[in-house]
Amino acid sequence: MAGRNAINKPKIKLHAQSHAKSLGRKRAARRTTATRSSTSRYAAKGTTAPRPTDSKAVALYTGNAPQPTSTMTTQTLSNKRAKKIARNQRYLAANKLKENETAMEVDNTSEQEKQTKLDQIKKALWSVIENHQKNGYSVVSDPEGTTLGIQSF
C-alpha cells in the first residue's frame, strides 16, 4: 500500500485522471465547431456548423476576387515551447553547417565510389573468373599437405 503522503495513492491517481479527463473534454469542445442547436440563435453564422437544410448554392465568379484574408488562430505558443523550438532550430542549423564543412573537405566522389553493392559484387566475381582463366587452379606443392588432407608434390 502506498504511504500516507505518496503521490501514487489510489485516491490521488483517480482524482488526477478525472481532472485530466474533464480538461480534455473542455479542450476538445473548444476545437470542434459548434452546431446551431448548441448555440444561441443570434450567434454568428461563421462560428457554427451549417445545418443540413442550409443552402449549398455556389456563387458564380463575377470577376471581382475577394481580398485575401489572413488566417487567425487562437492558439498561442507558450514561452517554454517557443524557446524549445528556437533552440532546436539553432541545433539544426549548426548540424547542417557542420555537415557542409565536412562535405567541403572531401573531394567529389568518382563513379567508382558511387557504384552500388550489386555492381561491386559483379565486378569481384568477374575478376575471379578472369584470374581463373589466366592462371588455372593453383595447387600448393607443400609436403605438409593440402586443404583436402592429401599430400601433393
Curated annotation (Swiss-Prot):
Pfam family, one: Alb1
Subunit structure: Component of the nucleoplasmic and cytoplasmic pre-60S ribosomal particles.
Gene name linked to the record: ALB1
InterPro entries found in the cross-reference section: Ribosome_bgen_Alb1
Keyword Protein biosynthesis (UniProt): no
UniProt protein name: Ribosome biogenesis protein ALB1
Function in brief: Involved in proper assembly of pre-ribosomal particles during the biogenesis of the 60S ribosomal subunit. Accompanies the pre-60S particles to the cytoplasm.
Major subcellular location class: cytoplasm
Biased composition (Basic residues): 10-30
Protein origin, superkingdom: Eukaryota
Keyword line: Cytoplasm, Nucleus, Ribosome biogenesis, Transport
Low complexity compositional bias, start-end: 31-44
Organism: Candida albicans (strain SC5314 / ATCC MYA-2876)
